């Protein structure tokens, strides 16, 4: 038995399922999860000392790579001045100014401690601002574990086969309407059936919690037009895509201006950070300037702000986002070429520093329904073979993968060499 397996058995005695976030339990791929002891650059090292090329990146935040010197030094420096004050600091201002500069639609920014807090707060704000109770989300999209958002959700909820969670009262869930991602007709139908009742649409601009699904041409433009016509707010949940798709986030990449934006992951540089922001007239509805209440003991934590500020400063240096996108493209197209070589039909999607691959003979993957038709069992086999070859992919067919600036030609070459061997084995087993 490996040390990771021993730790997992021990963890299950005191931690529900042995993990503090469900997808980490490897329920979507089988077997026992690896327990991580340390990480550096593009590599993670498990409790048994084995190294893996990491394409999970702590589920997105580690865009510079693990243990980056600039972030590490910023954290140490901030920690030496105090861990938490529960009072305003200049670092919060610096961080808000930088975020607003990079994402112009975020005229004002409120810091929180997680992506879930960001989306939960943005939806409360949208309801308070519009005076409407209903919200619209998309099937397979995940926006954190707030009650109103765990309806036909993606991510770990989808991995475990429970996209709509028990514990969410039906009377509460009725205020959440679910449309089909990449299908504007489904959006129009819901607005027509709920005239004047919908406060907002919340959407992942690139769906990353049913693997990786970019928008089809005209989808986001259509959402913007519909929201304007119906008096609803458009919320971009950029917790995953923020600063990973492009320097000015997915909204800059697709040239769409949402009313509100939610951020997380990358803006913390590995620390627990979230944020939401948008038009000043809307943000002024948040307490203490407005009636919509939102608060948090650790919001704007000085150590977390220092980490996030350092991360964004390095990430936005000239050429870095382009290099990240190039690396991702090489990896994704390499997977597809090798899968085809071994007679294994595959679709790959990629944008910026995120990617997804699907074992399927479908031409494209654009909706949740398309994803559910893919060969999940083949994905499980590929995941476990790659893990044995020292490559750590997302342990779920419904999660996007991530590259970092620390991934270079050496890591991509090693990953594709491993994939070649794994595809060959799967092809041989399929005969």
From Swiss-Prot:
InterPro entries linked to this entry: 4pyrrol_synth_GluAld_NH2Trfase, Aminotrans_3, Aminotrans_3_PPA_site, PyrdxlP-dep_Trfase, PyrdxlP-dep_Trfase_major, PyrdxlP-dep_Trfase_small
EC identifiers of the protein: 5.4.3.8
N6-(pyridoxal phosphate)lysine, modified sites: 265
Catalyzed reaction equations: (S)-4-amino-5-oxopentanoate = 5-aminolevulinate
Main location class: cytoplasm
Cell compartment(s), UniProt: Cytoplasm
GO biological process: protoporphyrinogen IX biosynthetic process
Gene Ontology CC annotations of this record: cytoplasm
Gene3D superfamilies per UniProt: Aspartate Aminotransferase, domain 1 (3.90.1150.10), Type I PLP-dependent aspartate aminotransferase-like (Major domain) (3.40.640.10)
Functional pathway: Porphyrin-containing compound metabolism; protoporphyrin-IX biosynthesis; 5-aminolevulinate from L-glutamyl-tRNA(Glu): step 2/2
Entry keywords, A to Z: Cytoplasm, Isomerase, Porphyrin biosynthesis, Pyridoxal phosphate
Keyword Zinc set for record: no
Extent of the signal sequence: none
Alphabetical list of Pfam families matching this protein: Aminotran_3 (PF00202)
Cofactor or coenzyme needed: pyridoxal 5'-phosphate
Complex and partners: Homodimer.
Homology family: Belongs to the class-III pyridoxal-phosphate-dependent aminotransferase family. HemL subfamily.
Protein name: Glutamate-1-semialdehyde 2,1-aminomutase
UniProt organism field: Aliivibrio salmonicida (strain LFI1238) (Vibrio salmonicida (strain LFI1238))
Gene expressing this chain: hemL
